[in-house]
């Protein structure tokens, strides 16, 4: 009976359980379950929870859903899904509580989870130089956040490297790879604001929006004025800015200056150190950039201080060596004499330094007998070798010169008295310190210390409006009209501006002031503008600006920023301020703004032809063709090389100078852009889970995005259920993932289409000055010369059709690179557009890209290992092509400079024979024009174009007062002539006359008037007066090693000129032969002199006087002369 009752109880319990489960199952049949997705992306695991999507509806959940919908409505305008709408009034929304009573709350009262990170679960996802990207979790909802402040994030996970504060210096992104190495000052997270399917909600500081996050390289932004240094202090400049905070730094291209930006407010002074004056550093301040010109501070200071005195300048410039020589002389005589005189009074000093150097002294004394050069009596070094006694160093008495009979240091006797003492004993110390060798060394150390003290005391060197009418304004960043500039945007309009068809009415709230004026708005602006501020913006700034104001608000207006250095329009200024706010609206607009450079920092250190270091060569014509002298010239195709040729016709009295200078040589590549690749910094995901159904059921709530989608089914079965879910082999989890790319480390991939050897060649002298680009494909030709390239080396590691990578350091890399739309595991994934949008990726994630896990009790989880293709790690296998950075032109070509010879440059010069003849009459010069453009008292000089018409062919010298010229001789042909000439003037040559002297004859001179001179201030921030710059150039030319080498070879120019291209080789051979010849004759003379001294011939000279003649005979040089047979006669008695 008991068994039957027990069975009955079990059946009833089972039926009750089944009934209860059926009711619950029916209630939850279409409900989704909680699930959690975990993204693992390198060192940045990301966890996202969808519990807000799947929880059982309660009053709290309904309220939270209403809040999220309100935030979404603030961001998205339902009627125009591609834009954002700013509310003019405070919006209110109804929220239903459990009692179904309506409650009204303000949008400003809604909680901002990103600002409450300190009290919520949060995790740092990435730290840049100027902001931080993090995520917070509240009520199982994950919020993505970007903030310019680190406040309240100290307790977040991965906050170990979080700085206490971020710099507030305004910056904007750099999108052009070529500019990154020049202007990069760190990185910053930006939001690319869009409403496409690949975006997601994100909050920047306290402003919610929709878009994608990317890490970008940034540069400084802002209004900054750089004041040139004055003559009194030529290495200090001052910078000023009207903005509240501005940043500056001195940067060498390619240098990492991520945390070296210096902020200032108002003004600041910068003093350049000698390292900054190498010509490679740039001063960056806001939008402004300035190249610090190459200046030898030591030389220039001496040139200025001792102007016009070459000897004082030389002494001053070489003072660093002269001061060492002076110290050496002081040590050798006065200091040594002083030390020798004070040895006894300073015995404590010698004991002290002896104690300090005792191990060294002990070692030297013990090893002295093994030294190759020893003194026989003093214990000092001796150059002349001779036998030395072993007892020489054991002078134990300071005052005595006597030596000890036995030297304990060198003694081999075992029973010596000193052997019973240790090396560290006082007996051994006194013995070692008092030896002559040790005492001489201690005195030498004392002399050196005194010399160093004196050396340290010696000097190192000798030497647009937005105003309604009067008092009502619109200020960017504030949605209300104001009456003046403000620190904080007011809560409502402070004035009113009514724009009518024929007039404008302005009124100030709180006063009775009403002003009327004519309608002078921008014409042809057709757009709707209802509020007062919209009318003002449409009137003064136009409809395009009004569209930006409505749909793309400024969170920080930067009211003091004008963008005057970049010449920004009102639209461009607004977009630049949006970039300062961390928002990217359009890649093309951003690329345009960030590519604007104010200043000369990108200018290369291009100087005039360095004639002082170029070799000189006399050149005689090879043949006469059609009445013209033909000169054949061959040069090595090497950048920086060249020759100064002196042209002759064997009869001409004056040689004509002709200079060829190869400025640069390299290879010009034509390329086709493929894609951009960048590392994945972090990952964002979104998904939806269901308790029953399959992927199709899940996709009804989480639609396919088109790429990087995933779906897992089934996710509900025995042992893998969550609370209130009893489905078996049902359910699905679907979603998508999006990567956050580090565009700071992006590479652009190109395909090589064509390569050509190119040389930039400058020609100066008799033909005037001009620079031309010569290629190997088509020979260059003009009226007087032809040039052609014969290439020896063309294969430099890059082949046609090969893929190359342009890195963030502006270098070119080659290697295994994936082609576009090729999923091969080589460097080149992810494949993106320039603005970081994927163009080739996985459409659906595979099983290897993620893993799924669950538990009997708890939430399901998905671990995504890789969101799309990622092979950026293979960049280590790429090979850098050249150490010289390159710059791309319109993403279609670049020039790769080479530092070695690529072949030969052959030039044929045809000069009319009349150039070498005296003009038969005064030439007629008509239609003259001389126009100049440049600067005075500067290194660049005035670039002038001289044009005229001549009736004769002749050679002429040219000159002009107060100016030096790049060339002083021109070849004038019959007909039209045009020359490029550079003039360096100390005064404005406007309306002055340039004089032409045909064949140097002043009797038939011709004058040409300077028509126009446009003087432009150079960008150089260090003024270099032309007078001192000329002296410096002259000094460098006179003291140049190349100039000296060319000078000592110059006597052989005439002979070597007959050997053509072997000119310089023959000069060196002749110089070496001459040196050997001089050495040979000097050796003979030395032998004669030695014999003369050795035989003492000078003692054998005698003065012979004949009896009958008072003439002095030549002295006899014989050593063994005969003696007189009789004594000399005495004539004293005749007196």
UniProtKB/Swiss-Prot annotation:
GO terms for biological process: fusion of virus membrane with host endosome membrane; symbiont entry into host cell; symbiont-mediated perturbation of host process; virion attachment to host cell. Residues 177-195 are annotated as: Non-covalent dimerization. Residues 1-35 form the signal peptide. This is Envelopment polyprotein. Residues 437-484 are annotated as: Signal for signal peptide peptidase. It holds the Pfam family Bunya_G1. It comes from Tomato spotted wilt virus (strain Regular2A) (TSWV). Residues 367-484, 1089-1135 are cytoplasmic. One of its GO terms (cellular component) is membrane. Tospoviruses are transmitted from plant to plant by thrips as the insect vector. The cell attachment site present in these glycoproteins may help in the adhesion of virus to cells. A motif (Cell attachment site) lies at residues 41-43. Belongs to the tospovirus envelope glycoprotein family. Keywords: Disulfide bond, Fusion of virus membrane with host endosomal membrane, Fusion of virus membrane with host membrane, Glycoprotein, Host endoplasmic reticulum, Host Golgi apparatus, Host membrane, Host-virus interaction, Membrane, Signal, Transmembrane, Transmembrane helix, Viral attachment to host cell, Viral penetration into host cytoplasm, Virion, Virus entry into host cell. InterPro entries: Bunya_G1, M_poly_TospoV. The keyword Transmembrane applies. The record marks 484-485 as: Cleavage. The gene is GP. Disulfide bonds join 114-145, 122-156, 224-285. Residues 36-314, 485-1067 are lumenal. The chain crosses the membrane at residues 315-366, 1068-1088.
